[in-house]
Amino acid sequence: MGNRDDEYDYLFKVVLIGDSGVGKSNLLSRFTRNEFNLESKSTIGVEFATRSIQVDGKTIKAQIWDTAGQERYRAITSAYYRGAVGALLVYDIAKHLTYENVERWLKELRDHADSNIVIMLVGNKSDLRHLRAVPTDEARAFAEKNGLSFIETSALDSTNVEAAFQTILTEIYRIVSQKQMSDRRENDMSPSNNVVPIHVPPTTENKPKMQCCQNI
């Protein structure tokens, strides 16, 4: 028998992107294992973790990928984005430069990923309110202008981490399930599904046999 963790209705690949040090790895570990590591070092290469959630009675298995934000690891981008249906674009609310770089990350994402990818802008480290360098309203306005959803999180104290992943996975599920319904409707209406078979009764007359419309 298979592992229960292997039983799912949908598998969605979601990537974490953003500058190094914004807390991508801790967002991943908080959501998938409910862990936080203050000594977390920069991720080298690529790693991913999985967790399943329920949406509308369906089991959604999220495969969440994390990679280092440093420029020297950019060689992995094409493989990293391949097959991704969602992305969390993360910045640190206490470091304005990480927010300034969001635009560059967004461009890279749109250059490499599927055009229909669902993107959420995430302002992480909301627990550092006293050090805030990026106003919430400014980030929200940027997200709205670029068609992104937006949330502020804290991997340290768990604030909104669950909500961020649940929101993006639910949005992906809605899009995928609506597309499946639309495809089914189109399939039901296609000519091949509307063929009415015509039965010609056999005749006893000795007429030459003709094959007509055999391939229709």
UniProtKB/Swiss-Prot annotation:
Domain of life: Eukaryota
Activity control note: Regulated by guanine nucleotide exchange factors (GEFs) which promote the exchange of bound GDP for free GTP. Regulated by GTPase activating proteins (GAPs) which increase the GTP hydrolysis activity. Inhibited by GDP dissociation inhibitors (GDIs) which prevent Rab-GDP dissociation.
PTM annotation (N-acetylglycine): residues: 2
Record keywords, A-Z: Acetylation, Cell cycle, Cell membrane, Cytoplasmic vesicle, Endosome, Golgi apparatus, GTP-binding, Hydrolase, Lipoprotein, Magnesium, Membrane, Metal-binding, Methylation, Nucleotide-binding, Prenylation, Protein transport, Transport
Disulfide bonds: none
Localisation per UniProt entry: Cell membrane; Endosome membrane; Recycling endosome membrane; Cleavage furrow
Gene Ontology biological process: exocytosis; melanosome transport; neurotransmitter receptor transport, endosome to postsynaptic membrane; protein localization to cilium; regulation of cilium assembly; regulation of early endosome to recycling endosome transport; regulation of endocytic recycling; regulation of protein localization to centrosome
Annotated EC: 3.6.5.2
Region of interest called Disordered, as start-end residue ranges on this chain: 183-208
Chief place where the protein resides: membrane
Lipid addition sites, S-geranylgeranyl cysteine: 212-213
Domain notes: Switch 1, switch 2 and the interswitch regions are characteristic of Rab GTPases and mediate the interactions with Rab downstream effectors. The switch regions undergo conformational changes upon nucleotide binding which drives interaction with specific sets of effector proteins, with most effectors only binding to GTP-bound Rab.
PANTHER family: DRAB11-RELATED
Function, in words: The small GTPases Rab are key regulators of intracellular membrane trafficking, from the formation of transport vesicles to their fusion with membranes. Rabs cycle between an inactive GDP-bound form and an active GTP-bound form that is able to recruit to membranes different set of downstream effectors directly responsible for vesicle formation, movement, tethering and fusion. The small Rab GTPase RAB11A regulates endocytic recycling. May also be involved in the regulation of preciliary trafficking and neosynthesized protein export.
Family assignment from sequence similarity: Belongs to the small GTPase superfamily. Rab family.
Name of the molecule in the record: Ras-related protein Rab-11A
Organism of origin: Gallus gallus
